[in-house]
Amino acid sequence: MFFVERFILKKLLSWKNSPYRKPLILKGVRQVGKTWILKEFGRRYYENTAYFNFDENEEYKQFFETTKDVDRILQNLMLASGQKIVPEKTLIIFDEVQDCPKVINSMKYFCENAPQYHVACAGSLLGIALAKPSSFPVGKVNFMQIDPMTFNEFLLANGDENLAQYLEQVDSLEPIPDAFFNPLYEKLKMYYVTGGMPESVLMWTEARDISAMQEALSGIIGAYERDFAKHPHLSEFPKISMIWKSIPSQLAKENKKFIYKVVKEGARAREYEDALQWLVDARLVHKIYRSSAPGLPIAAYDDLSAFKIYLVDVGLLRRLAQLAPTAFGEGNRLFTEFKGALSENFVLQTLITQFEVMPRYWSQNNPPYEVDFLIQRENDIFPVEVKSETNTSSKSMKKFKELFPDKVKLRIRFSLDNLKLDDDVLNIPLFMADQADQLIGLALEKMEH
């Protein structure tokens, strides 16, 4: 894994320094960089790191099965591995813990009886393990989520510190000068091609090797597809696989609502619900419910029968949809191809990292209107639209405002247009999606004055 500045390091440092620190469980999909980030964190901020991988050394599991005594567990681990562990000075990493309920459960004893040890656990498919609350250490751990690299992290990895820095320091709603605007669009197209999975980014930023990058993405998709077989009921395996493969087709529709019969002719919700939930728990997909109105709490207005499904990463979506990377050189094709789904997926990814509450969407039939996303920011709900062309006016956003005039302070549009606040519509260039929260704050301030 190559060196790259990942913003989660700041969060990890806050965890280390917190007086309320508990053992950490780092969640994230396979190959998103969990192990690398923990080792890098240990290297930077601790005297040493003690690393234990329960996939490679299954015999370590035994130490957790025979005792609840933390000192004894650590003594055994040190003797078996030859690594030293010093309270406060060592970062202890337990990796691949998803199949080790006893290890996960031992975090309770680390928390209660041995807070002087800094422990971090990681594992892929942890969402699945944690969905089964058999004997989980409730309230005894801190959770953190690591997502694919953001566009800003991609810029840093690509050697474009100047562009990343420019985006970080935007503090007004003035239009972005062409000297930044044009290169940022070109870089964003490249990000749509690579996505944010570190191995894929590495093949592009270090080697500029498109075919190696394609192979890296295929390898990651292959690893996920092998994971589907880990569902406890083998009969679910083909269903998970069919749902996964149907996602590009689901997003290529004008109306992106998830429809089971796109998965398989005649498929019914009840036959496929568990398989879909497995993908959601694994966080390989994001499930966005339809909201009937922009009320608070937003979850109270969920229509559980209508939802859209997006992929964990825009590059994986492009690869799964078999969209060739050559589209990068063809004008706006990456933005407009299959109904702008790559842009929607990209915007959703950044909204999830910036806002605590999972976004929703809004729609109504006859005549059909749809607002791509609703986001909750503090006690406000904002409609969000993603447009993959320039100069777009939107009937749905107008309709939404007509229906809920008191609820809509600001409407947000992500598009290929420049940054501007036009009455109550904030247009954010797609390449500034990572700055959405900050830009919304600036817009609200400006409107108040």
Predicted regions and their residues:
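Interdomain hinge/linker elements that couple catalytic modules in large macromolecular machines
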Residues: L156-Q349, T353, P359-N366
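Conserved lysine of the Walker
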Residues: K34
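A cross-kingdom feature that marks ATP-driven nucleic-acid transaction machinery
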Residues: F2, K16-L24, Q31, E40-R44, ...
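Short glycine-rich substrate-engagement loop in P-loop NTPases that contacts/grips substrate
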Residues: E56-P87
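Conserved catalytic segments around the Walker B and adjacent sensor/switch elements
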Residues: Y45-Y60
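Conserved P-loop NTPase "ATPase switch" module shared by AAA+ and STAND
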Residues: I85-K102
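Structural recognition of the conserved hydrophobic beta-strand(s) that form the central parallel beta-sheet
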Residues: I93, H118-S124, Q145
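Short regulatory helix/loop adjacent to the ATP-binding pocket of P-loop NTPases
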Residues: G127-F143, L155-D160
